[in-house]
UniProtKB/Swiss-Prot annotation:
Family affiliation: Belongs to the BKACE family.
UniProt-recorded name of the protein: 3-dehydrocarnitine:acetyl-CoA trimethylamine transferase
Native organism: Pseudomonas aeruginosa (strain ATCC 15692 / DSM 22644 / CIP 104116 / JCM 14847 / LMG 12228 / 1C / PRS 101 / PAO1)
The EC number(s) this enzyme carries: 2.3.1.317
Keyword list, A-Z: Metal-binding, Transferase, Zinc
Signal peptide feature range: none
Pfam families for the chain: BKACE
Function, as annotated: Catalyzes the condensation of dehydrocarnitine and acetyl-CoA, forming acetoacetate and betainyl-CoA (N,N,N-trimethylglycyl-CoA). Is involved in a L-carnitine degradation pathway that allows P.aeruginosa to grow on L-carnitine as the sole source of carbon and nitrogen.
Top-level division of the source organism's lineage: Bacteria
Cofactors required: Zn(2+)
Catalysed reactions, as listed in the record: 3-dehydrocarnitine + acetyl-CoA = N,N,N-trimethylglycyl-CoA + acetoacetate
Length: 294
C-alpha cells in the first residue's frame, strides 16, 4: 500500500465532453485556471491537453500550449506540469469497403511532430502512449507503432523530460518494458489507463495484473474513467501506486452532479486520507519522481 500519494489531475483531455458538461475548460485561460484550481485543491501534478477555443475540439497548436504553460508558471502554485504528447495519432479509416478513404477525424503525424510543444516548452513530464488501440466503436484507431514509440522515447530522453508511459493494455506494458531494456528511457513513470474502450477494463483483477507486471521499483499510477474513477483511486493506492482524477476522465462528482477538477481532487484526497495516506505536495512529488528542475 502507498501511504504518500502523487495526485494527478487531468483537467480537460481531448474527448467529446464539451456540451455534455457546463464547464469543460476550453480556452488556454480556462485550462490554466483549471490546473491552478486543481493545485489549490491538493493536486501534485496537472496533466494538460489544449482545445481549439472556437470549437472546443482537441488541438496540437503550440501557441495554445505556450499560453497554458506560461499562465500556470506565472501563478502562485508550483504544480508539476505534465503535457500530453499523444495528439497526432488519430486515424479514422474509411467506411465499409473503402478503408483507405480516411475520415475527417484523422489527425496523423510523425513522432517528432507530436513532441513540438514539448521541445519548446520543456515541461517536467510529458506522456508517451505506448501502443496502437481500437478507440471506441466505429472506425477510429489510435496509432502509436513500435518505430514511432522508439523515436519518441529517444527524443523525450534527449530533452531531459520525464516520460509518463500511458499503458492502455497489457501489450503496451510489454513494449514499454522492451524500450527500457533497450535503454531508450530513463526512470519513466507508468500510468495504467483503464476503462477506455477498447483497451483494458477498469476492474480490480486487471489493475493488479498490470501492476504485478511493472518493472521492480517503478513509480506508477492508475486510473479508471467515468464511474470507476474513484474506485480505481482506492485500488491504485492499495496496490502501491499513485492516482489520477479530473474532467478528462470523468465529468460527474455524484449522480446528476457535475464535477469540477477541484472537487474531484478533493474527493480523491478524502479517499486517500480515509485509507490512512496523504497527498504529496508538488515539491515532494518532484523529489519522489526525480524530476529535473525547470
Amino acid at each position: 500500500m502507498n501511504h504518500e500519494v502523487i495526485v494527478t489531475c487531468a483537467v480537460t483531455g481531448a474527448g467529446d465532453t464539451v456540451g455534455r458538461h457546463p464547464a469543460i475548460p476550453v480556452t488556454p485561460k480556462q485550462i490554466a485556471e483549471a490546473a491552478i484550481e486543481a493545485a489549490r485543491a491538493g493536486a501534485t501534478v496537472a496533466h494538460c491537453h489544449v482545445r481549439d477555443p472556437a470549437t472546443g475540439k482537441p488541438s496540437r497548436d503550440v501557441a495554445l500550449y505556450r499560453e497554458v504553460v506560461e499562465r500556470i508558471r506565472e501563478s502562485d502554485t508550483d504544480v508539476i506540469i505534465n503535457l500530453t504528447a499523444g495528439m497526432g495519432g488519430d486515424l479514422e479509416i474509411g467506411k465499409g469497403e473503402q478503408p483507405l478513404e480516411f475520415g475527417a477525424g484523422t489527425d496523423l503525424v510523425g513522432p517528432l511532430e507530436r513532441l513540438r510543444h514539448v521541445e519548446e516548452l520543456l515541461p517536467e513530464i510529458c506522456t508517451l502512449d505506448c501502443g496502437t488501440l481500437n478507440f471506441g466503436d466505429g472506425d477510429y484507431i489510435y496509432v502509436s507503432t513500435p518505430a514511432q514509440l522508439r523515436a519518441g522515447a529517444r527524443r523525450i530522453t534527449e530533452l531531459g523530460v520525464k516520460a509518463e508511459l500511458e499503458i492502455f493494455d497489457t501489450g503496451h506494458l510489454w513494449f514499454a518494458k522492451q524500450m527500457l531494456k533497450e535503454g531508450l528511457l530513463e526512470d519513466p513513470l507508468f500510468q495504467i489507463c483503464l476503462g477506455i474502450p477498447w483497451g483494458a477494463p477498469a476492474d480490480t483483477t486487471t489493475m493488479k495484473a498490470m501492476a504485478d507486471n511493472l518493472p521492480p521499483g517503478a513509480t506508477w499510477a492508475g486510473f479508471g474513467i467515468g464511474r470507476t474513477q474513484m474506485p480505481m483511486v482506492a485500488q491504485a493506492m492499495l496496490l502501491g501506486g499513485n492516482v489520477r482524477v479530473g474532467l478528462e476522465d470523468n465529468i460527474w462528482l455524484d449522480k446528476g452532479v457535475p464535477a469540477s477538477n477541484g472537487s474531484l481532487v478533493e474527493r480523491a484526497i478524502e479517499i486517500i486520507e480515509r485509507l490512512g495516506g496523504r497527498a504529496l505536495s508538488p515539491a515532494e512529488g518532484r523529489r519522489r519522481m526525480n524530476l529535473k528542475p525547470r
